[in-house]
Regions:
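Extreme N-terminal starter segment of soluble prokaryotic enzymes
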Residues: 42-44
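Glycine-rich, positively charged N-terminal anion/phosphate-binding segment
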Residues: 20-36, 49-118
């Protein structure tokens, strides 16, 4: 586990260009699932946890051989509009691989903008459709999306 790596500052980058090396196809979650199936072993996944699944926690999970890690839910609306939110909500480094960002969004426009900004830095993108937190549901995020699937 490396704690001396430098986090990537997303606020200074062109959202369509990555300064990281190209993503390795072996870090793709689908590849990992197939590999684990071939090895006849379970896939070890550290699911998203509010406030805890940030980079230092993901590094600890890697140390203990976790195959796939998630970020905590990041609100697309705040991420695309606010540099402070980008800097506090997501950081990564060259060792942060097989990572899936979990996005909370209530509209397609913010979702697409966030995906455009973050996709060079992650190996998968998940839309949160299950968070039952009242504040999120009230905003039309998380579990609220299941009540209006056409949205």
């Amino acid at each position: 586990m490396s704690t001396t790596s430098t986090a990537i500052d997303l606020s200074t980058l062109n959202p369509n260009l990555s300064t990281l090396p190209p993503r390795n196809p072996e870090h793709n979650p689908l590849f990992i699932f197939q590999k684990c199936k071939d090895e006849k072993r379970p896939v070890f996944i550290a699911g998203p946890m509010v406030r805890y699944s940030k980079l230092p926690f993901r590094e600890i999970c890697r140390y203990y051989k976790t195959d796939i890690v998630y970020t905590p839910m990041i609100l697309a609306r705040e991420f695309v509009r606010n540099e402070v939110a980008r800097l506090s909500d997501f950081s990564t480094n060259e060792f942060d691989r097989s990572v899936i960002v979990q996005i909370g969004a209530n509209n397609v426009t913010d979702l697409i903008k966030m995906v455009d900004m973050i996709h060079p830095y992650v190996d998968g993108i998940g839309l949160n459709c299950g968070c039952p937190i009242k504040e999120q549901v009230r905003e039309g995020i998380g579990a609220a999306l299941m009540s209006e699937p056409e949205k």
